[in-house]
Amino acid sequence: MKLGELKIETLMLIFPSISIDVDTESGDALNEALSNLKADPNYCDYLSAMTGAINRCFTNLESKGVLPLRYTTFSSADFALEADRLSLDISKIKGKIERVDFRNLWERKENCDFTLEGNSLIVEDLGEGVYTVVYEAEIPRIKNITGANYIIDLPDKITSLMPYFIKSEVIMTDDSDEASSARSLYEAGIAEIINSSNRYGYQGEVESVFRV
């Protein structure tokens, strides 16, 4: 979903009587629609408040354990040998490491023991092979200057719930009951994702953090 789409969908939740029809595939059309809305005194304050609310939503999603898991692989030769263990600088991986797997021609070992020491990943030396680091990537935060066509790289089932969280944040001082109702819808949707998802079942996105 594009950032401009998210803001417009949230605005239509806040103001159910308005209908904003815009060709989201057209970058110019989305920019124009959002610019016109920002110029309207009825909507500008709500749109301005959405940047912080969206970033708070990202933080909330990271705490829920619902984000798609990504992975990247390393050869054992990429690690530094320290006594009977291997050490690797993983400072370029931005997110929470969920597990480490190992494989070679003879064996496959899942959920290897690992520890984190600063920016270093420490694993047992299992010989020559490939280590797969599975992690939940941090969501990049947006700024007030982030454009309407910025892509929020999250599954549709997650982005479809975000307007409820954002609405609950930006109308809290205006209508606390309506804000609570919107947050409840968001939390219910997130709970459904948690109950129905096998997180280890959708690791299809590969982020090339390091060259193997």
Residue ranges and their predicted role:
Residues M1-V212:
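Glycine-enriched, solvent-exposed interface loops adjoining structured elements
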